[in-house]
Curated annotation (Swiss-Prot):
The gene is mtnB. Transmembrane segments: none annotated. SMART domains: Aldolase_II (SM01007). One of its GO terms (molecular function) is zinc ion binding. GO terms for cellular component: cytoplasm. Pathway: Amino-acid biosynthesis; L-methionine biosynthesis via salvage pathway; L-methionine from S-methyl-5-thio-alpha-D-ribose 1-phosphate: step 2/6. InterPro entries: Aldolase_II/adducin_N, Aldolase_II/adducin_N_sf, MethylthioRu-1-P_deHdtase_MtnB. This is Methylthioribulose-1-phosphate dehydratase. PANTHER family: METHYLTHIORIBULOSE-1-PHOSPHATE DEHYDRATASE (PTHR10640:SF7). It comes from Enterobacter sp. (strain 638). Keywords: Amino-acid biosynthesis, Lyase, Metal-binding, Methionine biosynthesis, Zinc. It is an enzyme of class 4 (lyase).
Length: 204
């Protein structure tokens, strides 16, 4: 698949995300892998529902630098980390949904465990509601290098799939292509909403 076609799919996903209100106030960032050395990442400060192909910057996966000199997203280091940690990841979506942001603060543990929901099967490799989907939860940090280091250390100790939550911040998820990343995002967001409602009802 050509870079332009991949970027077109990513722009479509960004507009879909924007229409759902999942990246408010220019928040969030999205990318695709170009090859082993570079990715295309959304430029900082842009409304995600209005992005065009020209709003994506080529970024060096090893150095986090944009050869063009333009400013990539604040969380560039998280995207490049995912591409280094997960060779199968070719698209990354980082969003600020209400469910992900609030649920990440309700979970006091380092992992969110979800089970019993049919929609777990929206995640690649999940075949039954009887399994448990584990989503790591990391404390937010404005020092992205330090945060990336913590995530990398966790991944060495406890390999994980699909995505992770940043406490009080949002969800980062990925897939083998834009379509899979988008499906993982929609599936996880649905599961987070179910988990939120279940926790609310259990308190009544």
């Amino acid at each position: 698949m050509t870079d332009n076609l991949q970027l077109t799919h990513l722009v479509d996903a960004c507009r879909w995300i924007g229409a759902k209100g999942w990246a408010p106030a220019t928040g969030g960032n999205m990318s695709i892998r170009q090859n082993d050395a570079f990715c295309w990442l959304s430029e900082s400060g842009k409304d995600k529902g209005s992005l065009t192909i020209d709003d994506f910057l080529q970024v060096d996966i090893a150095s986090n630098r944009a050869p063009s000199g333009r400013k990539p997203s604040a969380e560039t280091g998280l995207h490049t980390l995912i591409y280094r940690l997960f060779p199968e990841a070719n698209a990354v979506l980082h969003v600020h949904t209400v469910n992900a942001t609030v649920l990440s603060r309700l979970v006091k543990e380092t992992e969110l465990r979800i089970s019993g929901f049919e929609m777990q099967k929206s995640l690649t490799g999940q075949s039954t509601h009887l399994d448990t989907v584990t989503i790591p939860v990391f404390d937010n940090d404005q020092d992205i290098d330090a945060l990336a280091s913590r995530i990398a250390h966790y991944a060495q100790e406890r390999p994980f799939n699909y995505g992770f939550l940043l406490r009080g911040h949002g969800l980062t998820c990925w897939g083998r292509d834009v379509a899979e990343a988008r499906r993982h995002l929609e599936g996880l967001e649905f599961l987070f909403e179910c988990e939120m409602r279940l926790r609310q009802l259990e308190k009544i």
